[in-house]
């Protein structure tokens, strides 16, 4: 069930980030950078999650400023996420494992600060400006943060189980 207020959103964000952080904290770079059969590594997944927090914050700021909000990013449509994610992996190829972990932590802190500073009515009082759907900024924040943290943890556990 999706969070419906700031307190719930902060609680689920902290819970899911802590779980992911503990999971990746013990992984060394050789494990994190080993690609699976589809060419995707744990490092790729974690870097992707950090990136999507910045995407969300950019969408929010663009909407607040009355700018065009590019979903998911300029030059891409939602049905082109595979291409977007592949292009993102190419852009992030030179990030090492410690850089990725730091980017995730920094992203979490930015998301947490956004939620803490955003008034409740701005988070859950109506659709996010520029989003062209009914999702509130709080729901978008949950999708970019806690939901992505949870799916990354699941991917990592599956990857480790399959490898071991």
List each language-model region with its residue ranges.
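Residue-level recognition of alpha-helical structural elements
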Residues: 6, 38, 67, 93-100
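Extreme N-terminal tail/first-helix region
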Residues: 1-18
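Structural signal for well-ordered, non-membrane alpha-helices
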Residues: 17-28, 53-57, 61, 105-119, ...
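Short, charged helix-helix connector/hinge segments
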Residues: 29-34
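Short amphipathic alpha-helical segments with heptad-repeat character
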Residues: 10-14, 46, 50, 98-101, ...
């Amino acid at each position: 069930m999706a969070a419906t207020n700031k307190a719930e959103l902060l609680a689920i964000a902290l819970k899911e980030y802590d779980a992911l952080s503990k999971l990746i904290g013990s992984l060394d770079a050789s494990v994190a950078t080993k690609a699976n059969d589809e060419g995707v590594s744990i490092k790729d997944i974690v870097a992707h999650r950090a990136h999507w927090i910045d995407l969300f914050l950019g969408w929010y700021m663009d909407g607040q400023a009355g700018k065009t909000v590019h979903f998911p990013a300029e030059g891409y449509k939602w049905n082109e996420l595979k291409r977007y994610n592949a292009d993102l992996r190419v852009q992030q190829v030179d990030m090492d494992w410690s850089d990725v972990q730091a980017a995730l932590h920094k992203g979490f802190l930015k998301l947490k600060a956004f939620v803490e500073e955003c008034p409740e009515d701005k988070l859950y009082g109506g659709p996010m400006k520029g989003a062209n759907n009914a999702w509130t900024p709080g729901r978008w924040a949950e999708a970019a943060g806690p939901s992505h943290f949870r799916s990354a943890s699941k991917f990592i556990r599956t990857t480790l189980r399959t490898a071991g």
